[in-house]
């Protein structure tokens, strides 16, 4: 009887804990086909890469959606610069696309191997996860010169940079790795199942990461390795952005984008 009571108590705890973890999530958009990357322009308009739809979708503050760009094969990572130029990686066709605010598009860099998540570095270069080669490539957007800034990774899919210029890389293999400017690597992923594309810097020592395998958003202090679970029960969580003190999470399971407070 005592054992059954303990099992029942554990069930009740997990049930309510799961409910609480979802209570602060709000669905802000739906109808996507595998939302993989999320970014915002200077006006607060959200852009979502529609992986299976080969398109990029704009979501206005009133929830209205429109197709911003069509015809990019398996769009994955997305970032937007201060001039509202949009940069997107084509996972299947191995290039980086630039789309200007007036809609003109151009392939600005090619020859990658399944480029997935992308991010701006602290000095304005484009960081690209080269999934199939296990590398992080830095692209100078002026000269278009490529530099390999990290290698020896296991299926890297997401990257972000800390204030001290260290990189933190999420890898579908289960690894989460910090690479210091001197090349030293620290493994951070002991408590992660399968880190996904979404990863963002939230302070000098902390990042938030999609744990795709666990259906969670997790925060980790890169110095202490302390992990805090921010959200759970997310079906096929892949994308993550941090904008105006809110996280935005893209889920493949139901083709939606959710938001939650990041304070």
Descriptions of predicted regions:
Residues 21-48, 53, 257-261:
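An edge-strand/N-cap motif at the start of beta-rich repeat modules
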Residues 24-29, 64-69, 104-109, 144-150, ...:
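A short beta-strand motif characteristic of beta-propeller blades
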Residues 30-43, 71-83, 95, 111-125, ...:
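Beta-rich, blade/repeat-based domains predominating
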Residues 41-76:
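N-terminal, post-signal-peptide region of Sec/Tat-exported proteins
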Residues 59-64, 99-104, 139-144, 179-184, ...:
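Short loop/turn segments that connect beta-strands within beta-propeller blades
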């Amino acid at each position: 009887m005592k054992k059954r009571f303990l099992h029942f108590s554990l069930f009740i705890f997990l049930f309510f804990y799961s409910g609480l973890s979802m209570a602060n999530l709000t669905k802000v958009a739906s109808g996507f086909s595998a939302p993989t990357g999320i970014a915002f322009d200077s006006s607060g308009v959200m852009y979502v890469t529609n992986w299976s739809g080969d398109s990029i979708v704009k979501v206005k503050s009133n929830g209205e959606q429109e197709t911003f760009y069509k015809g990019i094969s398996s769009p994955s990572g997305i970032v937007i610069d201060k001039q509202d130029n949009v940069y997107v990686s084509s996972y299947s066709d191995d290039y980086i696309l630039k789309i200007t605010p007036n809609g003109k598009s151009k392939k600005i860099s090619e020859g990658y191997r399944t480029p997935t998540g992308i991010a701006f570095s602290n000095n304005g270069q484009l960081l690209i996860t080269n999934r199939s080669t296990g590398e992080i490539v830095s692209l100078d957007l002026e000269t278009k010169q490529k530099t390999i800034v990290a290698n020896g990774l296991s299926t890297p899919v997401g990257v972000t940079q800390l204030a001290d210029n260290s990189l933190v890389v999420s890898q579908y293999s289960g690894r989460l790795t910090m690479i210091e400017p001197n090349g030293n690597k620290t493994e951070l992923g002991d408590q992660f199942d399968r880190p996904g594309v979404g990863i963002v810097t939230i302070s000098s020592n902390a990042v938030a990461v999609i744990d795709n395998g666990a259906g969670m958003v997790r925060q980790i202090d890169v110095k202490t390795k302390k992990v805090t679970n921010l959200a759970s029960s997310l079906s096929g969580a892949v994308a993550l952005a941090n904008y105006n003190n809110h996280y935005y999470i893209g889920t493949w399971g139901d083709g939606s984008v959710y938001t939650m407070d990041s304070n």
